[in-house]
């Protein structure tokens, strides 16, 4: 397929490259020129503007947005509405709030422009391993763009979740679970680190990957973290929250579903900004490993 990609950050740039490797044609646009030039070297078709990107696509046109949630998504949709026509498709692959996705889909309906919300997991490793995709929208439209999902995802790694908003809802809960998992691992390593024994956290995170009931990809990343910096002394225990954890807690409250672990892990991140905690340093380091998220180092203070 031929697709437009707007937003060439850590995720958008790698997704563009994976699509190119899968023999898709990708027209790219970004607010700054550097990432466009970099993508063009790998075979992408550069665009000078959103209008230029749309002009270079065949009908029905498919445009993937990989920009930060909130205003950037709305701004790009407003710009795209000037040029897209009935049955053209906008895919929002960012971490948008699911209710915003519902509103955006509704606002596009009068023009006949189709909207697909797609939760994307895989972080900086997605180029090599593939991205887990959770998407929602009109079923016929989603079936039409399935070749894109098939290329981006590993085998069995993409799922049609339901109508507009459902993809980002599933991704929201996915990230809420991630909050709880990271918190549990980090607290465990903090208990190990503070024990009377001289324990090798790298070796422990390694052995737990073989046959243990707690084995996971996160432990593989933990092994990398502790190999590079066994004490995490250079890190501040400051952990950002990206929004989805908060939204998951809010959804749980609205739906009268108790979610104490996810709630506690969110509060722990907020509290991390005023504490010196080994567990919070561990979470910060792990988030950097899987998502390329920024870490705050003591030298930055």
Where in the sequence are the language-model features?
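Rossmann-like NAD(P)-binding element
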Residues: 31, 44-103, 109, 127-136
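Rossmann-fold dinucleotide-binding core
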Residues: 76, 97-186, 192
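General beta-strand structural signal in soluble alpha/beta enzymes
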Residues: 47-48, 91-92, 114-118, 157-162, ...
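Hydrophobic residues within alpha-helices
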Residues: 15-19, 80, 104
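Anion (oxyanion) recognition and catalysis
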Residues: 20, 40, 102, 109, ...
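NAD(P)+-binding Rossmann beta1-loop-alpha1 motif at the extreme N-terminus of oxidoreductases
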Residues: 1-62, 87, 124-126, 288
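Helical "substrate-binding/catalytic lid" subdomain
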Residues: 134, 144, 165-293
